[in-house]
Amino acid sequence: MFSYGQRSKCADLLNSYEKTKTKTFEEEKRIMKTRKVMALAGAGVLAVSMMTGCGSSSSTASTTAAATTTAAAAETAKEAATTAAEKKADLTGSITAAGSSALKPLVDDAADMFIEKYPDVSITIDAGGSGEGLKQVSEGTVNIGNSDVEASAKLDETQAKELVDHQVCVVTMAPIVNNDVKEGGVEDLTKQQLIDIFTGKTTNWKEVGGPDESIVLVTRPTSSGTRATFQKYALDGNEEASNTSMETDDSGVLLQNVKDTKGAIGYVALSYLTGDAGVATVAIDGAEPTLENTYAGKYPVWTFEHMYTKGEPDEVTKTFLDYIMSDEYGAKMESLGYGVSSKMTNTEH
């Protein structure tokens, strides 16, 4: 048997053991809880890492796809540029044209721009009048015959049928006078007054409200398409009087003659009047010779311009004609004084 003192000591030892056991158990619980939290945290990190990895992979794939697309587009553009350059380099040959002096400024300008695109092409352009241009293209001595009138007006039926018409623009013809005539009071003439002047019936400007000086006609040869157009629409078909000392179908020369000669009158296409030409235009029955009035059907003296070929044109000539009639070049026509055919509200005179 244990004494009371021994039993008390045993009890103290037992209590101490239980406390130690409890403390150890609680510590183990805490450790397990900590491990669980760390495990969850690790799983989270792993998940984030996986997601990041996927995102990086997706981003890389997108970047790669975009780069591939860009490279493909660049290659396509390069191929197109190469094809265009090859086509530009491949177009060679020569083009000859003759005829209408009214159309010549446009054809000259278009030729300069065309040669910039196709430097291995040469283009030669002469005037000479619509009749001469139609004659030469019919004979095969030029590739293109430029004309203010239809081929049937200058050639016989058989010759005219051999030609192919390429209608390129509208040209307006304006009566022009020396500046002293306008300063003397002549700004507007009726059609009848114009007829009387050009047929020789009226010989002094004072008869139509102008200065007391003789009227000097600066005329064109019968081969001129500009003359044919002016006679038909300004003179109602009446034949104009001849003045051989002042006759020319070179519009530049005609313009200079009117500018230098007191009392002079003539007519040119608006394309020769885009700058300060040094002459004055005259209205007909109150309608000024402008593109706007031509489009609206108010001004009567205009015509379509034609570029004829004998049969279908060869490749280089066709490419040139297509260029003149393209939207690319069409935007420039009006600045040169020519009308765009599609803007005509009334194609009947």
Q: PLM features: what roles do these ranges have?
A:
Residues 31-41:
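Bacterial N-terminal signal peptides that target proteins for export
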Residues 49-53:
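C-terminal motif of bacterial Sec signal peptides marking the signal peptidase cleavage site
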Residues 55-56, 61, 66-67, 72-73, ...:
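Exported/periplasmic ABC-transporter solute-binding proteins
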Residues 10, 38-39, 81:
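Sequence-pattern detector for short linear motifs
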Residues 4-31:
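Short, Lys/Arg-enriched N-terminal segments with co-localized hydrophobic residues
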Residues 44-48:
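Alpha-helical transmembrane segments
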